[in-house]
Each structure stands twice: as structure tokens, then as C-alpha cells.
């Protein structure tokens, strides 16, 4: 029987990145070494007020990108200025953990981000103070799973990379080891 498949970045984390982090921060315990916890992808669909089918279409694209069925997000309260009613579908989100998380991260770093127009690197200040990194992508068509010819509308998305790191410096070092393209 063939060996169980393991994502490339997970193998790299176990074999190389953990050792590099241990060496850099000299942790007393192996369990103190930061690791990736989850990746949350959120798509807010502003046009949902005009057409209630838009969040469903966005969720289909998000499912193709993430490889997992997203949850349709609904408005918590009504905002008359934006023509939003309570419980109206306004977007989609998905939380990736485990192997799907590593697979998505690999595609994001090596395929999607280099395809972004005028990409000069990720902002190294986009950490939240607790070891989590957030970024936004303006066009979802940079992912190879999306067929450019079949897309009638482009949506942006927020991508939050959650780590077990306790500080921004640890998280920045971890993501740099994963070859995140931070600008200098």
C-alpha cells in the first residue's frame, strides 16, 4: 500500500522550519514552537443587496478555491444606508485546517500572489499583535481553480493566517520560513 499523502509545506515544516525556529528563538519545549493553526478566507459581496444570488455564486467560487464548502454569512442587523436587512446573505467564509490549509497556503504563496497585478510584496505590518496575519486580495481570479472565461464578476477576499505564535516577531519569522513574500 502506498504511503499516506502529506502536503509539501507540512513536510517542510516538520523537517526544516521547526528546527530553524527552535534555533532562532531557543524554546525550552518543542510544543512552544509556533505552527500554523488555521486559515480563514472571507468574501464580502457588496452587490448582495441588489441580487440575492450573488453570495451563492461567490460561495461556489470560494469552494473551488478552498476545496471545502463555505458558509454563507448573513447580516447581523439592518443598515438602512446600505439597504441591508437583518439575516440577509452578504458573503461567504471558509475555515481551513490541517492538510487543506497547507495545500491552500502552497497555492497562495507560489501561484496566486505572483499573479496579482502590481504585486510588490505583503505588508509586514499586517500582524494583529497576537501572532495572526491578515491580507486582502482584490481579484479572486488570481487562483488557478477559477476559470477566467466563466467569471462574470470579480470579488475580493480577506485571508487571515492564524498561528500559535505569541508575538508578531515569532509569527513573522514563521511565515518568512514558509517563504511569504513580505516587502522589505
From Swiss-Prot:
Q: Name one GO cellular component term.
A: ribonucleoprotein complex
From which domain of life does this come?
Answer: Bacteria
Q: Which UniProt keywords apply?
A: Ribonucleoprotein, Ribosomal protein, RNA-binding, rRNA-binding, tRNA-binding
Record GO terms (molecular function)? rRNA binding; structural constituent of ribosome; tRNA binding
* Any GO BP annotation: translation
What is an example of a Pfam family matching this protein? Ribosomal_L5
Tagged with keyword Manganese:
no
Report quaternary structure and partners.
Part of the 50S ribosomal subunit; part of the 5S rRNA/L5/L18/L25 subcomplex. Contacts the 5S rRNA and the P site tRNA. Forms a bridge to the 30S subunit in the 70S ribosome.
Role of this protein: This is one of the proteins that bind and probably mediate the attachment of the 5S RNA into the large ribosomal subunit, where it forms part of the central protuberance. In the 70S ribosome it contacts protein S13 of the 30S subunit (bridge B1b), connecting the 2 subunits; this bridge is implicated in subunit movement. Contacts the P site tRNA; the 5S rRNA and some of its associated proteins might help stabilize positioning of ribosome-bound tRNAs.
User: What does the sequence similarity comment in the record state about its family?
Assistant: Belongs to the universal ribosomal protein uL5 family.
Q: What is this protein called?
A: Large ribosomal subunit protein uL5
User: What is the species of this protein?
Assistant: Agrobacterium fabrum (strain C58 / ATCC 33970) (Agrobacterium tumefaciens (strain C58))
Starting at the broadest rank, the lineage of the source organism is:
Bacteria, Pseudomonadati, Pseudomonadota, Alphaproteobacteria, Hyphomicrobiales
Amino acid at each position: 500500500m502506498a504511503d499516506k499523502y502529506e502536503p509539501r509545506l507540512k513536510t517542510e515544516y516538520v523537517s526544516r522550519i521547526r528546527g530553524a525556529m527552535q534555533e532562532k528563538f531557543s524554546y525550552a519545549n518543542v510544543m512552544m514552537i509556533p505552527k500554523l493553526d488555521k486559515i480563514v478566507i472571507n468574501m464580502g459581496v457588496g452587490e448582495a443587496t441588489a441580487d440575492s444570488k450573488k453570495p451563492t455564486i461567490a460561495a461556489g467560487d470560494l469552494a473551488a478555491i478552498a476545496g471545502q464548502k463555505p458558509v454563507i454569512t448573513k447580516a447581523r442587523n439592518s443598515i438602512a444606508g446600505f439597504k441591508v436587512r437583518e439575516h440577509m446573505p452578504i458573503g461567504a467564509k471558509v475555515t481551513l485546517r490541517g492538510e487543506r490549509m497547507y495545500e491552500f497556503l502552497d497555492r497562495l504563496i507560489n501561484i496566486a500572489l505572483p499573479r496579482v497585478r502590481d504585486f510588490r510584496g505583503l505588508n509586514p505590518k499586517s500582524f494583529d499583535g497576537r501572532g495572526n496575519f491578515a491580507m486582502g486580495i482584490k481579484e479572486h481570479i488570481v487562483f488557478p481553480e477559477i476559470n477566467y472565461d466563466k467569471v462574470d464578476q470579480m470579488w475580493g477576499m480577506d485571508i487571515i493566517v492564524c498561528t500559535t505564535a505569541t508575538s508578531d516577531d515569532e509569527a513573522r519569522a514563521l511565515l518568512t520560513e514558509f517563504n511569504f513574500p513580505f516587502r522589505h
